[in-house]
A protein has these predicted regions:
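Conserved active-site beta-strand-loop modules that form the wall/rim of enzyme catalytic pockets
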Residues: 111, 164, 194-197
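Canonical P-loop GTPase G-domain recognition
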Residues: 78, 84-153, 172, 277-279, ...
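Short, structured loop/turn "capping" segments at alpha-beta junctions
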Residues: 131-135, 165, 171-177, 243-248
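Long, charged, alpha-helical interaction scaffolds
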Residues: 53, 100, 115-116, 128-129, ...
Length: 309
């Protein structure tokens, strides 16, 4: 059996396992939090000119809450590909083209460094003026104080609050590196002419659809206490081993043995743990610690630009 057959077997095995690592009954996003926020968004849409849907550029389809999108798509929508520095450009471009076909605008941002923020402000103003004022050019019109209102939505831990703080130039929204930081809606001013409403992060109803739950867990959207981090790390290893470029970066990062293709995901995780000194008494590998090291390295881009879709 050659290495390509082994990779195909690994891929099929993960498909069969589906999302056993996600105890969906423990993820209590419904009905209260989600249903209430959806009602509030629906109520507030009449005040809104533009909707910014913040996506994780590594999982631009899995990070879209379809229920929210169906609710807001009657408005002008900008798909914001955040964390674009962590994703491979060809995959981003492919996803952008799909959303453009659906009538959405797209832009890439990095809410940590501020890359793309000025372009996003410019796009909000350009679209906002077109939506609210059409082609008016009179002198009296030019003197009107223009205000454009945008609603920001997205899944937990996608960088919404950091993005808003970069837009506003101050710490207006609560920020953290774990899901569920923003608890309420709030209006935030951006300069003199843009007002942004932040909303709590909203997970999709069905985390098992197309294995999206596993991808969301890998990027850190789902709280670690409700998932099996070792099984999620196994899923990440399976993805890394299914692509020659990803595999080469993975091996280089942890100085792994060249012939690890023949090993199972748990055995590969043990190698990662041993290389990183995640050891218990008796020279046993602390596989939970190894899983956390691997997941954190992926989330912070230390393995490389790896897309999960």
């Amino acid at each position: 059996m050659d290495m390509y057959q082994k990779r195909e077997m690994r891929k099929n095995k993960k498909m069969e396992e589906n999302t056993k690592s996600l105890p969906s009954a423990s993820i209590n996003w419904y009905p209260g939090h989600m249903a209430r926020t959806l009602r509030e968004i629906k109520h507030d849409l009449k005040l809104i000119d533009i909707v910014l849907i913040v996506l994780d550029a590594r999982i631009p389809h899995s990070s879209l809450n379809k229920e929210v999108y169906e609710l807001v798509k009657s408005k002008t929508v900008i798909m914001v590909f955040n964390k674009s520095d962590l994703a491979a450009i060809p995959s981003i471009t492919e996803a952008q083209n799909k959303y453009k076909k659906d009538g959405c605008y797209t832009i890439c941002t990095n809410s940590v460094t501020g890359e793309g923020i000025d372009k996003l402000k410019e796009l909000i103003r350009t679209l906002g003026e077109k939506i609210k004022y059409g082609n008016k050019t009179s002198e009296s019109f030019k003197k009107i104080k223009k205000v454009y209102r945008a609603l920001v939505v997205g899944i937990p831990n996608v960088g919404k609050s950091s993005l808003i703080n970069k837009l506003s130039g101050r710490n207006s929204a609560e920020v953290g590196n774990k899901p569920g930081i923003t608890k309420r809606r709030q209006w935030i001013k951006v300069g003199q002419d843009i007002e942004i409403m932040d909303t709590p992060g909203l997970l999709s109803k069905n985390l098992n659809e197309d294995n999206r739950g596993e991808r969301l867990a890998i990027v850190g959207t789902i709280k670690p206490e409700v998932i099996d981090e070792e099984l999620i790390a196994h899923t990440l290893i399976s993805i890394l081993m299914s692509n020659d470029w990803y595999m080469s970066m993975f091996k280089a990062r942890y100085d792994l043995d060249p012939d690890i293709d023949s090993l199972t995901e748990p055995k590969i995780l043990e190698q990662v743990g041993r290389k990183r000194g995640a050891l218990l008494k008796g020279d046993r590998v602390d596989t939970l610690k190894a899983a956390r090291i691997l997941l954190e390295d992926y989330r912070t881009g230390k393995i490389g630009k790896v897309n999960l879709e």
